[in-house]
């Protein structure tokens, strides 16, 4: 579903789903605003956002890219991960829209 503001990745059976893996963290603001708008208009009942858990950084610090650089440089603190999402949920940027936040951690990597 597309709004005048932002695309949601998937919409099915009144559930909006978005996967944010390594985008700039402002993407969460757009996702939450879109889900909030859809919820307020009665188009969805819940939003689901999947992102990285903080403990995945332990793996990224050890893994190297093709140039021998630590992957943590690519997956830094300004990109999407659970800590950036929870801050926004605690600030109620989702309005009244229920959000299921899922963090993919190192045990799932």
PLM segments and residue spans:
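Active-site metal-binding core of divalent-cation-utilizing nuclease and nuclease-like domains
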Residues: 1-13, 26-33, 40
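Class I S-adenosyl-L-methionine-dependent methyltransferase catalytic core
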Residues: 2, 29, 42-58, 67
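Glycine-rich, often proline-containing surface loops adjacent to acidic residues and nearby aromatics
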Residues: 11-18, 47
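Residue-level marker of positions within ordered structural domains that often coincide
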Residues: 15, 22, 40, 52
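Short beta-strand-loop-alpha-helix junction that forms the active-site gateway
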Residues: 18-27, 56
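Catalytic core segments in nucleotide and nucleic-acid processing enzymes
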Residues: 21, 32-47, 90-95, 101, ...
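Short capping loops/turns at secondary-structure boundaries
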Residues: 24, 28, 40, 71, ...
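Domain-level recognition of nuclease-like catalytic cores that cleave nucleotide substrates
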Residues: 54-109
């Amino acid at each position: 579903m597309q709004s005048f503001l932002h695309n949601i990745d998937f919409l099915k059976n009144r559930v909006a789903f978005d996967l944010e893996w390594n985008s700039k963290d402002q993407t969460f603001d757009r996702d939450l605003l879109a889900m909030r708008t859809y919820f307020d208009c009665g188009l969805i009942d819940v939003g689901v956002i999947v992102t990285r858990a903080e403990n995945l950084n332990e793996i990224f610090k050890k893994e190297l890219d093709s140039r021998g650089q630590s992957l943590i440089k690519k997956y830094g603190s300004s990109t999407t991960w659970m800590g950036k999402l929870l801050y926004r949920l605690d600030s109620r940027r989702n309005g009244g829209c229920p959000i299921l936040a899922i963090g993919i951690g190192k045990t799932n990597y």
